[in-house]
Each structure stands twice: as C-alpha cells, then as structure tokens.
C-alpha cells in the first residue's frame, strides 16, 4: 500500500504539490493525468523517493520514504512506474544508461548491472550500440 498524507513540495517559491493525500492499495493500478507542468512526474518521483518533499509523509507498505533508515532500493522495487518520457543521460553510453537505474534503484553492483544490461542489449540485437 502507498499512503500519502498532506505532501507538499516547492521548487524555490513555486509550489508544485499542495497537501496531496491519497491511499493506493496493493495491486491497484493508478494513472496520473494532467497538463504539462501540473506536477505528475514530481508526484511519482516523490513517492519513489527520487525527489525530496518539504512537508507531509509518504509510506510504502508502512515504511516512511523520508526515513533515513528505509532501504530505498527495496522500497522502490515494490512500486512500479512508467514515465511518459525516458530520462536518458546523453553524456553516458547506452550501457551506462542501462546500468544506472539498476545500481541506484535495485542496489546491484556495477558489474552485476553491466552483466544484466549487456544480456538485454544482446537479446534485442543492440550490442553494436553498447558504447
């Protein structure tokens, strides 16, 4: 279960989340819709502790995402999300882009992440583009 209680976030003086409160049950699928700049991506990133927030509380399966003791890679593995646009880093190679999330979100070592990434590149016939 995901639970948000009065979550607010600002970028400087601009408030992008205003006292957001909701509960999402395990297995429930939620689509976040709205116009450009309405805070959709910020909301999703905040739930996954990829973006800090200034006020309120967020819990995933009873664990507070803002608690420094929370195992964030484990927490993130329990919340599925699909972004509208991929956020790739143009200064990184294809392999580096593939491994970054595995290291940061799944907690894999760089070597484990590279092994997995190369396996999937090979599977889809893109090994020539790995560098």
Stretch-by-stretch model annotation:
Residues 14-15, 73:
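Short coil-to-beta microelement around the adenine-binding A-loop and adjacent beta1/P-loop entry
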Residues 33-35:
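The feature captures the beta-strand-to-loop junction immediately N-terminal to the Walker
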Residues 57-59, 63:
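ATP-binding/catalytic-site motifs of ATP-hydrolyzing domains
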Residues 63-64, 99, 110-129:
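Conserved ABC ATPase "signature" region
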Residues 48:
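Helix-to-loop junction immediately C-terminal to a conserved catalytic motif
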Residues 91-101:
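Short coil-to-helix segment of the ABC ATPase nucleotide-binding domain corresponding to the Q-loop/switch region
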Residues 65-80, 110-111:
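ABC ATPase NBD coupling module
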């Amino acid at each position: 279960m995901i639970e948000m209680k009065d979550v607010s976030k600002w970028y400087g003086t601009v408030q992008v989340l205003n006292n957001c409160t909701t509960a999402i049950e395990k297995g429930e699928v939620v689509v976040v819709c709205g116009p450009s700049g309405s805070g959709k991506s910020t909301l999703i990133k905040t739930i996954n502790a990829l973006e800090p927030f200034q006020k309120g509380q967020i819990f995933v399966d009873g664990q507070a995402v803002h608690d420094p003791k929370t195992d964030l890679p484990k927490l993130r593995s329990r919340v599925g999300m699909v972004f509208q646009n991929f956020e790739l880093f143009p200064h990184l190679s294809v392999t580096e882009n593939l491994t970054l999330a595995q290291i940061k979100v799944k907690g894999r070592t760089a070597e484990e992440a590279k092994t997995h990434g190369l396996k999937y590149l090979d599977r889809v016939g893109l090994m020539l583009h790995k560098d």
